[in-house]
Curated annotation (Swiss-Prot):
Predominant place of localization: nucleus
One Pfam family in the UniProt entry: Homeodomain
Family, per entry: Belongs to the EMX homeobox family.
Bias kind Basic and acidic residues: ranges: 1-34, 325-336
GO cellular component, one term: nucleus
Molecular function (Gene Ontology), one example: chromatin DNA binding
Listed name of the protein: Ventral anterior homeobox 1
Compositionally biased residues, Low complexity: 236-250
Matches recorded under CDD domains: homeodomain
Gene: Vax1
Compartment list: Nucleus
DNA-binding region(s) in UniProt: 100-159
Gene3D superfamilies the record matches: Homeodomain-like
């Protein structure tokens, strides 16, 4: 008798528990359906992979395994994946999925013109100026503030792009100039003069340094000697002796104009013919001085010009090549 009563009690308790579980399940299904109805259609069509498992969902899963009811901060929703099957995911209740997106502010042409003018005047508009500008343009202060922030960001980006482009252009120009200088140095010989004056290069400077050409002086030696002899014959006494003195100073008399003394003997007369001076003794002394040290003067002038050319080439793109060429040329000239 008592055993049957116990069995009946157990059976009643099990039926009561089953009814309670079914009621809870029905209530949960209603909540799920309500949540599904409130979600937008685009959200329901998204696959399950679009939602990553966060720490909150893991906490919700742990709490679900521990207790039959979900905590207050969890939200269970149903999502239809790409295959059409419905899956259940758990998200925090703080995630507001129903909130509409913020609309993008569209400015009119007049508003943009006024905002741009104010930005050119002052990049930071605060306080009363911003309030007055927003009132005049029929905008809120937040819209004006956000527009100025975006405009400053755009200006910084543009400045960065401009500086980068400027650096690229300057580097390209420098490279082109260096290549042009290298090409000029390869096609043209570097400026310079030899150490000795007689085999000097052609040009205005060389002709000025040389003065009368050497063949002309040599050719005029015969005429100079004849004129000197005539002057010695006509001049009486000491004048004839004075007129014969310059050839002796210039050098020993040689056989004809091509001899060693031909150049020095013809030099006073050539100078006399050029400058038309009546004093042959003065011309003879000047010619003797010039003929005594032509190599030293030529060497000093050529050395100075070589130094100037080296300084000029030191600022060019082919500096190493010019320095080596100058050194080799100087060594060869010193050996000669």
């Amino acid at each position: 008798m008592f055993g049957k009563t116990d069995k009946m009690d157990v059976r009643c308790h099990s039926d009561t528990e089953a009814a309670r579980v079914s009621k809870n399940a029905h209530k949960e299904s209603r909540e799920i359906k309500g949540a599904e109805g409130s979600l937008p259609a685009a959200f329901l069509k998204e696959p399950q992979g679009a939602f990553s498992a966060s720490g909150a969902s893991e906490d919700c899963n742990k709490s679900k395994s521990n207790s039959s009811a979900d905590p207050d901060y969890c939200r269970r929703i149903l999502v239809r994946d790409a295959k059409g099957s419905i899956r259940e995911i758990i998200l925090p209740k703080g995630l507001d999925l129903d909130r509409p997106k913020r609309t993008r502010t569209s400015f009119t042409a007049e508003q943009l013109y006024r905002l741009e003018m104010e930005f050119q005047r002052c990049q930071y508009v605060v306080g009363r100026e911003r309030t007055e500008l927003a009132r005049q343009l029929n905008l809120s202060e937040t819209q004006v503030k956000v527009w100025f922030q975006n405009r400053r960001t755009k200006q910084k980006k543009d400045q960065g792009k401009d500086s980068e482009l400027r650096s690229v252009v300057s580097e390209t120009a420098a490279t082109c100039s260096v290549l042009r200088l290298l090409e000029q140095g390869r096609l043209l010989s570097p400026p310079g003069l030899p150490a000795l004056l007689p085999p000097c290069a052609t040009g205005a400077l060389g002709s000025a340094l040389r003065g009368p050409s050497l063949p002309a002086l040599g050719a005029g030696a015969a005429a100079g000697s004849a004129a000197a002899a005539a002057a010695a014959a006509t001049a009486p006494g000491p004048a004839g002796a004075a007129s014969q003195h310059p050839p002796a100073v210039g050098g020993a008399p040689g056989p004809g104009p091509a001899g060693p003394g031909g150049l020095h003997a013809g030099a006073p007369t050539a100078s006399h013919g050029l400058f038309s001076l009546p004093v042959p003794s003065l011309l003879g002394s000047v010619a003797s001085r010039l003929s005594s040290a032509p190599l030293t003067m030529a060497g000093s002038l050529a050395g100075n010009l070589q130094e100037l050319s080296a300084r000029y080439l030191s600022s060019s793109a082919f500096e190493p090549y010019s320095r080596t060429n100058n050194k080799e040329g100087a060594e060869k000239k010193a050996l000669d």
